[in-house]
Amino acid sequence: MERAFQNRCEPRAAKPFKILKKRSTTSVASYQVSPHTARIFKENERLIDEYKRKKA
């Protein structure tokens, strides 16, 4: 038998489109923010979590 049939591997050309995975979260830690802004971000995160718990 041919080698391609033994391995049962698809050649790379058979998949012309690359599947991109969507990032689930974005990172805020990549840049520095003022302490005031950091507090606002933290408070927003807390409120979003509280809202999600009430909706669930």
From Swiss-Prot:
Keywords: Sporulation, Toxin-antitoxin system. GO terms for molecular function: toxin sequestering activity. Induction: Expressed during exponential growth and sporulation. A member of the spoIISA-spoIISB operon, it also has its own promoter. It comes from the Bacteria. Disulfide bonds: none annotated. Disruption phenotype: Decreases sporulation efficiency by 4 orders of magnitude. A double spoIISA-spoIISB disruption sporulates normally, suggesting its only role is to neutralize SpoIISA. InterPro entries: Antitoxin_SpoIISB. One of its GO terms (biological process) is sporulation resulting in formation of a cellular spore. The isolated protein is unfolded; X-ray data suggests the inactive complex forms a heterotetramer of SpoIISA(2)-SpoIISB(2), which inactivates the toxic activity of SpoIISA. Belongs to the SpoIISB antitoxin family. Antitoxin component of a type II toxin-antitoxin (TA) system. Antitoxin that binds cognate toxin SpoIISA and neutralizes its toxic activity; unlike most antitoxins it does not seem to be highly labile upon expression in E.coli. This is Stage II sporulation protein SB.
